[in-house]
């Protein structure tokens, strides 16, 4: 049975697509209304729409917007057109010229009486329907105008009324003439003047100037000047605001009366607005003002591929008001399209249904196995049951949704011309034409997806059609190759369907009896031929149709030179940075081994480690032909884990292609190109990224199956995760190379732990097998190594030890090695030197010296020599005899350090005593200094052997010191105060020696001085207290005798001052206490004086005080003299005036003691004259400075 005989309606009948302008004749409209399928979804949408529309008929509403959304091809434009017929209730004639209104076509399609009633209510309401595609009605550059929407609304509104649409100010003139009743008269006059009808000529506004002006002046109230002025200024003065437009529409509706409606039906408004917030704002204001002004009498219906919420969200501004106006929102889904096609095209007659049911029953399992897709494909519908098969045959269910995606992809990527049919009717036509092509095929035939190419070929861009045409004319290709090529084009932009061999075979199935295995072979052969002709490209497992531009780009990419070394380098980067990312192998929680990375013969990164991971690729193997034996030898020789990858070069080929693409893009990055080429470059960049993902996958698989060689053996590691396989290999390598790694069982993690180890109360180290130290084997290894090098006189540093034991066969950590060095150092097995100075365990920065980079190359390590017991005994004996200490350590360093502590303590005591010698002579200073010198000699020695030898050398010196220093210390403890008193008496005598002539005093002083100045006076110091007592008593007695005449002089001077003061009673109280206190002070000091010379000096001090006091009295008396006054005359009082300055004699007070100085001996008259002469001369000299001299 032929397929065409199965259908209920003739498959070859003429079905129009969406009716365009010029096709709206009754015949086409009749067929459109008659065959329109009301699906369940459409029934629901119609119910919602007419329910909302009814509110504007029966009442008032400002929610007068309808937003119809749906994907490309969902039938929204057709739905909008049908609504326009229903709202207008358009009347059409059938073939028999019987008039039928649009609503009546739906009497049997709408089974819901409520919906049908609402439809009839709308149809019975007079309505002006304005249906238009906004893109075709707007000016070419209108999108840049923020008022573009309202201008289009105004244009179509004017056209609906018969006014000029393209020139809005002419439409305003026409509207005004209609109001004035002059419009028909004007048109007749214009035609009479111009010879052309007004409707024909008004578009040529600027060529009909004279005719327009003359007609206006003759038929309207305008004069010729006024008409000319309007003509010249009309365009400049014209402006249409949204508010003015809304009012104009309202006035029109009100003028019509009888509940008249106007409906604007705008197709593709969503696409027109796009992401332009200015256009969205303009639409919002237009709809809002119309809603407010017209109250539901004017409606706006629009279509968009996006729902309104998405459009508002995309624009990102506040368009909440427009959402409120478009309260009715209808969304068409793909299920609606499927249902329409099934009912209009694929509906079967009874014979066809029976035939197909039997066919499905016999082949259902075959169909399930035949129609399969790869696992990475999105859901593709297949025949679910018998009814499904009957409804869809000869098509397959997945083809409905897939063809929609094809149409959308072609449109989005610009592969279609301007006239690719839109919406449900496009799919309808495609399915009808494909069915027609296979109409004569027998039952069992299935329509391959490639058949849909012919249905859209006429609408495709020439660049696509050219590729197919050239393929058809290519003698190296056959017809089936071209069909595969067409298929690859159709699914080129469908991401949900990878164009791999499995999917291509399913899409190319033409009959239920097809052998899919053979089909794949046939398709694969076609793909190979197409690839050779550069018509397609293989990307991984997918095949991609290439446009002419893409073919050109691919040829350029293919010619890009890529060095194989760069390919290997990039593969290495993927292996070592993506697949196996670890930079260190974690052998255990404590041991992480760094390793070198090599691929073929190319090192990746620095090669500074003892072990490595080496990858052998097919490229390297092809040039060297390594067999297993050679790889085993290589693994032993290089201390590497070696992985030989399988011979599959997929990842190498992919990487080569990636590098070619990158090279092409780099060269073209600064070159201007067409938009098509730029798009291809973007896709190529994306392709390179996809290939990178595949490289990762291919390399991972290769590593899973790679042969592994370690330490001259091939490992039997099962196929599993590459990281686990490599880690297993590294473990074997470490176990073999680092066979003494297990010597370390207790680990050090921080420098703090080293410090704690350093201060542990353990000094003895035993290297025997019974030692409890968990790391004894490791410590012994380090000790033996230091011993060997010291024996050979080789200098070794901390750095050298660390380097040695971090390598094979040890592999120990730096901090662990440092701990072993510390243990040996504390155990006195080794010595450490920094800048030729020996270090001790008490060094504050010892851990830094052993671990820090700044020091490890400077700290020298030597095996330590043992100190003899005899030398250690010397130190112990001296400790006992010199310092009286017997509790001492038994180890070399401990004993040395303890003895040094004793020496430091003694040195501190000596320093304290030596301070006493700074200002005073004391006995025993030489003993202390000699002892200090000996101590410092030992303290400056850090080397243990040198220290013990030096102690032996200074043994006698220390014993002598111990004997000599005892009386010195005793002196400072008990005798120093008596000694200081004696020295004080010597100093007193020395100061008064001139005045003291008594022989007894001199004798006492001599005895005291003999004892004090003796080198070792300690045994005679007990005599000093008696001598001091005798000296003090006699010295005081002599001093008191010397002070007696001085006291008399002081008293005499005091009386002289009082006599003078008593002469002036008016000032006595002023000076008395002051003078008395001054003289009492001198007397008191005289009573406490200790020296003769101080007592004698007080006599002169008293004389000077006397003179100063008398001067004070004289000055005060002079100051108190009254000023000169003038007497009163008559009524005038005495005026006090300053005294007249007159010559005044200068007075001077001189002590009598200063007139005659020295001792005078008078034996005769001449001597008397001489003395008097001396007195005279002195007085004369004093008179030179004063007129009056007063002797006191």
Curated annotation (Swiss-Prot):
One GO BP: defense response to virus
Induction (record text): Part of the brxA-brxB-brxC-pglX operon.
Protein origin, superkingdom: Bacteria
Keyword Transport: no
Signal sequence, start to end: none
Keywords from the UniProt entry: Antiviral defense
General function of this protein: BREX systems (bacteriophage exclusion) provide immunity against bacteriophage. A core protein of a type 1 BREX system. This system allows phage adsorption but prevents phage DNA replication, without degradation of the phage DNA. Methylation of bacterial DNA by PglX probably guides self/non-self discrimination. When the brxA-brxB-brxC-pglX and pglZ-brxL operons are transformed into a susceptible B.subtilis strain (BEST7003) they confer resistance to bacteriophages SPbeta, SP16, Zeta, phi3T and SP02 and partial protection to phages SP01 and SP82G (these include lytic and temperate phage).
UniProt record similarity statement: Belongs to the BrxC family.
Name of the protein this chain belongs to: Probable ATP-binding protein BrxC
Protein encoded by which gene: brxC
């Amino acid at each position: 049975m032929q397929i065409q005989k199965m259908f209920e309606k003739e498959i070859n009948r003429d079905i129009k697509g969406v009716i365009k302008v010029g096709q709206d004749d009754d015949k086409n409209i009749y067929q459109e209304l008659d065959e329109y399928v009301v699906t369940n979804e459409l029934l629901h949408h119609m119910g919602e729409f007419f329910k909302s529309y009814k509110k504007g008929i029966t009442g008032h509403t400002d929610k007068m917007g309808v937003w119809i959304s749906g994907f490309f091809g969902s039938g929204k434009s057709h739905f909008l057109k049908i609504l326009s017929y229903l709202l207008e209730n358009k009347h059409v004639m059938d073939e028999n010229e019987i008039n039928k209104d649009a609503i009546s076509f739906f009497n049997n399609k709408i089974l819901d009486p409520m919906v049908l009633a609402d439809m009839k209510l709308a149809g019975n309401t007079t309505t002006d329907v304005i249906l238009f595609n906004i893109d075709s009605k707007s000016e070419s550059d209108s999108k840049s105008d923020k008022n573009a929407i309202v201008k289009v609304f105004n244009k179509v509104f004017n056209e609906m009324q018969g006014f000029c649409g393209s020139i809005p100010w002419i439409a305003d003139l026409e509207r005004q003439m209609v109001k004035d009743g002059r419009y028909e008269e004007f048109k007749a006059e214009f035609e009479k003047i111009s010879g052309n009808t007004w409707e024909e000529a008004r578009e040529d506004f600027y060529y009909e100037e004279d005719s327009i002006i003359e007609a206006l002046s003759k038929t309207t109230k305008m004069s010729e000047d006024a008409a000319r002025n309007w003509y010249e200024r009309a365009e400049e003065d014209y402006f249409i605001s949204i508010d003015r437009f809304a009012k104009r529409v309202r006035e029109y509706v009100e003028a019509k009366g009888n509940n008249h409606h106007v409906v604007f039906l705008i197709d593709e408004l969503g696409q027109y607005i796009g992401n332009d917030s200015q256009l969205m704002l303009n639409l919002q204001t237009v709809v809002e003002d119309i809603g407010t002004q017209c109250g539901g009498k004017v409606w706006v219906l629009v279509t968009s591929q996006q729902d309104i919420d998405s459009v508002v969200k995309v624009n990102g501004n506040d368009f909440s008001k427009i959402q409120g106006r478009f309260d009715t929102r209808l969304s068409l889904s793909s299920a609606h399209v499927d249902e329409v096609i099934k009912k209009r095209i694929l509906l079967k007659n009874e014979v066809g249904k029976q035939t197909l049911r039997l066919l499905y029953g016999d082949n259902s399992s075959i169909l399930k196995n035949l129609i399969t897709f790869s696992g990475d494909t999105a859901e593709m519908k297949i025949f679910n049951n018998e009814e499904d098969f009957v409804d869809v045959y000869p098509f397959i269910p997945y083809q409905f949704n897939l063809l929609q995606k094809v149409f959308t992809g072609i449109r989005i990527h610009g592969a279609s011309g301007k006239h690719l049919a839109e919406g449900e009717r496009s799919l309808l036509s495609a399915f009808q034409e494909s069915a027609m092509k296979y109409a004569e095929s027998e039952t069992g035939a299935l329509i391959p997806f490639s058949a849909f190419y012919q249905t859209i070929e006429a609408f495709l861009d020439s660049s696509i059609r050219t590729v197919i045409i050239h393929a058809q004319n290519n003698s190296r290709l056959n017809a089936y190759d071209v069909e595969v090529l067409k298929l690859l084009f159709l699914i080129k932009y469908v991401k949900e369907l990878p164009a791999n061999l499995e999917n291509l075979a399913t899409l190319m199935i033409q009959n239920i009896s097809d052998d899919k295995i053979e089909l794949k072979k046939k398709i694969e052969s076609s793909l190979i031929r197409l690839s050779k002709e550069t018509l397609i490209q293989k990307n991984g497992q997918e095949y991609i149709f290439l446009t002419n531009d893409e073919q050109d780009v691919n040829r350029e990419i293919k010619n890009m030179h890529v060095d194989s070394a760069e390919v290997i380098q990039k593969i290495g980067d993927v292996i070592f940075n993506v697949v196996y990312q670890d930079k260190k192998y974690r052998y255990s929680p404590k041991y992480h081994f760094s390793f070198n990375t090599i691929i073929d013969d190319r090192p990746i990164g620095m090669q500074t480690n003892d072990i490595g991971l080496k990858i052998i690729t097919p490229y390297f193997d092809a040039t060297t032909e390594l067999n297993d034996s050679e790889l085993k030898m290589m693994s032993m020789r290089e201390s590497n884990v070696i992985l030989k990858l399988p011979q599959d070069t997929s990842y190498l080929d992919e990487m080569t292609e990636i590098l070619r693409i990158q090279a092409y893009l780099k060269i073209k990055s600064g070159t201007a190109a067409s938009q098509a080429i730029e798009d291809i470059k973007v896709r190529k960049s994306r392709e390179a990224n996809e290939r990178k993902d595949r490289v990762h996958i291919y390399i991972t698989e290769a590593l899973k199956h790679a042969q592994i060689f370690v330490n001259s053996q091939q490992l039997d590691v099962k196929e599993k995760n590459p990281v686990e396989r490599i880690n297993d290999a590294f473990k074997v390598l470490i176990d073999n190379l680092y066979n003494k790694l297990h010597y370390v069982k207790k680990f050090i993690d921080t420098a703090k732990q080293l410090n704690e180890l350093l201060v542990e109360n353990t000094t003895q180290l035993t290297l025997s097998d019974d030692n409890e130290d968990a790391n004894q084997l490791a410590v012994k290894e380090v000790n033996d190594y230091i011993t060997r090098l010291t024996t050979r006189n080789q200098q070794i540093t901390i750095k050298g030890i660390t380097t040695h034991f971090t390598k094979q066969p040890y592999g120990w950590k730096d901090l662990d090695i440092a701990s072993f060095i510390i243990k040996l150092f504390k155990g006195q097995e080794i010595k450490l030197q920094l800048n030729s100075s020996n270090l001790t365990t008490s060094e504050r920065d010892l851990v830094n010296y052993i671990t820090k980079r700044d020091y490890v190359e400077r700290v020298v390590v030597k095996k330590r020599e043992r100190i003899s017991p005899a030398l250690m005994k010397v130190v112990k004996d001296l400790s006992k005899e010199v310092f009286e200490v017997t509790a001492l350590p038994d180890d070399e360093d401990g004993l040395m350090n303890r003895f040094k502590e004793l020496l430091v303590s003694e040195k501190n005591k000596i320093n304290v005593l030596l301070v006493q010698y700074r200002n005073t002579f004391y006995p025993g200073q030489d003993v202390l200094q000699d002892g200090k010198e000996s101590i410092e000699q030992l303290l400056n020695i850090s080397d243990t052997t040198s220290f013990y030898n030096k102690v032996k050398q200074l043994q006698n010196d220390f014993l002598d010191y111990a004997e000599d220093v005892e009386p010195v210390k005793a002196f400072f403890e008990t005798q120093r105060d008596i000694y200081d008193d004696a020295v004080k008496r010597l100093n007193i005598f020395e100061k008064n020696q001139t005045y003291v002539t008594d022989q007894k005093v001199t004798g006492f002083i001599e005895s005291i001085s003999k004892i004090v100045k003796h080198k070792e006076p300690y045994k005679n110091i007990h005599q000093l207290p008696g001598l001091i007592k005798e000296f003090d008593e006699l010295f005081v007695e002599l001093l008191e005798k010397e002070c007696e005449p001085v006291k008399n002089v002081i008293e005499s001077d005091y009386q002289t001052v009082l006599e003078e003061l008593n002469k002036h009673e008016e000032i006595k109280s002023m000076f008395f206490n002051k003078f008395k206190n001054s003289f009492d002070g001198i007397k008191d000091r005289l009573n406490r004086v200790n020296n003769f010379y101080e007592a004698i000096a007080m006599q002169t001090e008293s004389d000077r005080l006397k003179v100063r006091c008398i001067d004070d009295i004289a000055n005060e008396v002079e100051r108190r003299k009254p000023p000169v006054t003038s007497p009163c005359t008559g009524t005038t009082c005495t005026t006090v005036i300053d005294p007249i300055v007159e010559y005044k004699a200068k007075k001077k007070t001189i002590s009598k003691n200063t007139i005659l100085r020295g001792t005078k001996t008078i034996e005769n008259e001449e001597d008397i004259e001489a003395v008097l002469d001396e007195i005279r001369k002195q007085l004369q000299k004093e008179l030179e400075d004063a007129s009056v001299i007063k002797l006191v």
